[in-house]
Amino acid sequence: MECPEGQLPISSENDSTPTVSTSEVTSQQEPQILVDRGSETTYESSADIAGDEGTQIPADEDTQTDADSSAQAAAQAPENFQEGKDMSESQDEVPDEVENQFILRLPLEHACTVRNLARSQSVKMKDKLKIDLLPDGRHAVVEVEDVPLAAKLVDLPCVIESLRTLDKKTFYKTADISQMLVCTADGDIHLSPEEPAASTDPNIVRKKERGREEKCVWKHGITPPLKNVRKKRFRKTQKKVPDVKEMEKSSFTEYIESPDVENEVKRLLRSDAEAVSTRWEVIAEDGTKEIESQGSIPGFLISSGMSSHKQGHTSSEYDMLREMFSDSRSNNDDDEDEDDEDEDEDEDEDEDEDKEEEEEDCSEEYLERQLQAEFIESGQYRANEGTSSIVMEIQKQIEKKEKKLHKIQNKAQRQKDLIMKVENLTLKNHFQSVLEQLELQEKQKNEKLISLQEQLQRFLKK
């Protein structure tokens, strides 16, 4: 395996395990990572070393002598000059290959050592930093000044562009980095990972390969803002239901994120618009039937060639209805279980509220009977020993009545707002009937509240 040319960069001081990349190159030296047949990787300096003024110095005298002799031979044979030029141009036209690079992340103390080696431009760097890749291609042994470190090649959740510069003004892109070699000081670094026993079952082989790939997946980026970026940004894809019957049995909200739902809704609305008469129902989340209507609806008596404006209006009306009756589902895939728990809690709260209302009604009836008996015993509403306790009970009941009255008024206000927004006549009639019931309840609560206040005033006067 051959790794690209590049010098290890200076990593951030704030990172506990600073990142040392092989993708950046300074203007002084270009170290290269080479792998021999024994899978041992060493760093070797390139033949040409760029100086401060941009001049190139040959690696040795033999190379310079060969270049001079070739130039003299070309001068003595001018008839072969054009042919040699054409051959050199054809060789120069070979497209540049994209380099394969990865990021080297080391512990803090070893990262400082490698950084100093890179800055010193020492020729002995190849003896002080070695990378030995294991046959599986995912594990390696990194030696920093004869200190072995266990390393693992992981896949990054994002692609990082590698740039190279010679004058620190102009940058050239050399590669896209998507892997990182993470080194740790602890771990078994001498033994290669054990190969599992070969199996003929393709399913078992596929599962094992998937398990190996998941172990080599890095869930974080290389900067602090990209912590857990794979979990936050890459959501699980929605599974497509193959059976249509199962899809009909399931609720609409379970597949609200499916891409085919929007097209299905448009098709249903289009078929309703083209129909002469329609029958439709509005069902709440708890499964109870709210509205049932049959017959022709003036708002939906549109010809088959209706305009896109009408279609958009119908779909927007459907979205409004869905928003009113079934609140939009949360988009966080990681909190699906929490959403189910919230729904169960809401149902439990509704049941608790119903029970509380029943208990309050029973307590109110009991209090009224007790007050009537007290009035009969006292004759002309004279106070006795139990008068103070009855006054306290009356005050509690008045507070409860006021709270319930406030809730009913809020519900009535919401119904009025819905009536103002909805354009469908049938829905308006339904909301109007609900509003009338709420107004009737409000009137009854007001009467009971006034009665309790009068009784309280009588007890306080006595």
Curated annotation (Swiss-Prot):
Residues 1-97, 327-366 are annotated as: Disordered. The gene is TAF7L. This is Transcription initiation factor TFIID subunit 7-like. Residues 342-462 form a coiled coil. Keywords: Coiled coil, Cytoplasm, Developmental protein, Differentiation, Nucleus, Spermatogenesis, Transcription, Transcription regulation. Pfam families: TAFII55_N (PF04658). SMART domains: TAFII55_N. Its main location: nucleus. Belongs to the TAF7 family.
